[in-house]
């Protein structure tokens, strides 16, 4: 097709069967090792940004301590990028936030998390300890980017109150929770983040939670 190269229908069918054979071989190899209590090989993981930064590191360190012969790699991206990597067989297992989106992927709940609204301590933003959903219309926000599980969950929560994301005053969409926290240090706006990501900031008093 012009300057593009693409597989024919037969080629796609062959590729699909080759991928299945490869997966079956990897599974057989894994199960054969288990028969001899051997844990070797490679495990390619993928995780959305918040999970990769705040949840997995201690778990991966513990895993490596127990299974030193297993080679681990971790791909970091937003939830949709990780789902795409899983579909393309670039990773063996993915960890994502948010809602179950794709019917051809099997999702299993890993842990529960909570999104919270936060401002920097001492912010000039006129918010107390609690606001109503309708007050969000009048507050400047900084949010995660499109494709992130954090934004998906927040948008679904808004829909439960008949609020459209497009009707809010979003100053910035940023690609990581760390970026949001740094942004909040220098601006008077409200951020929506995972509560797991702000443990240190809450302890040090840099940020405070605003209940919605």
Regions found by a protein language model. Give the residues of each.
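Hydrophobic residues within well-ordered alpha-helices
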Residues: 8-11, 45, 85-87, 136, ...
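Beta-alpha-beta core module
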Residues: 103-109, 113, 175-212
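A short, glycine- and basic residue-enriched loop/turn
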Residues: 1-5, 12, 35, 42, ...
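Alpha-helical "hinge/linker" immediately C-terminal to small N-terminal DNA-binding modules
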Residues: 6-37
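Flexible hinge/capping segments at coil-to-helix
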Residues: 102-142, 146
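Secondary-structure junction motif
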Residues: 141-162, 195
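Central regulatory/effector-binding core of bacterial HTH transcription factors
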Residues: 36-103
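Short beta-strand-to-loop elements that line the ligand-binding cleft
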Residues: 70-77, 165-176
């Amino acid at each position: 097709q012009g300057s593009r190269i693409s597989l024919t229908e037969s080629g796609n069918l062959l590729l699909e069967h080759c991928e299945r054979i490869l997966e079956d071989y990897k599974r057989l190899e894994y199960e054969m090792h288990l028969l001899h209590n051997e844990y070797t090989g490679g495990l390619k993981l993928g995780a959305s940004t918040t999970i990769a930064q705040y949840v997995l590191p201690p778990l991966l360190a513990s895993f490596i301590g127990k299974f030193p012969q297993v080679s681990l790699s971790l791909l970091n991206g937003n939830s949709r990028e990780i789902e795409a990597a899983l579909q393309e067989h670039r990773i063996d297992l993915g960890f994502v936030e948010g809602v179950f989106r794709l019917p051809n992927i099997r999702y299993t709940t890993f842990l529960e998390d909570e999104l919270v609204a936060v401002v920097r301590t001492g912010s000039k933003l006129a918010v107390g300890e609690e606001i109503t959903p309708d007050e969000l219309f009048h507050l400047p926000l900084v949010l995660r980017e499109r494709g992130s599980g954090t934004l998906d969950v927040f948008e679904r929560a808004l829909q439960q109150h008949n609020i459209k994301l497009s009707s809010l005053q979003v100053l910035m969409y940023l690609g990581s929770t760390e970026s949001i926290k740094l942004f909040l240090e220098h601006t008077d706006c409200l951020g929506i983040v995972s509560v797991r990501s702000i443990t240190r900031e809450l302890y040090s008093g840099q940020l405070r939670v605003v209940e919605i």
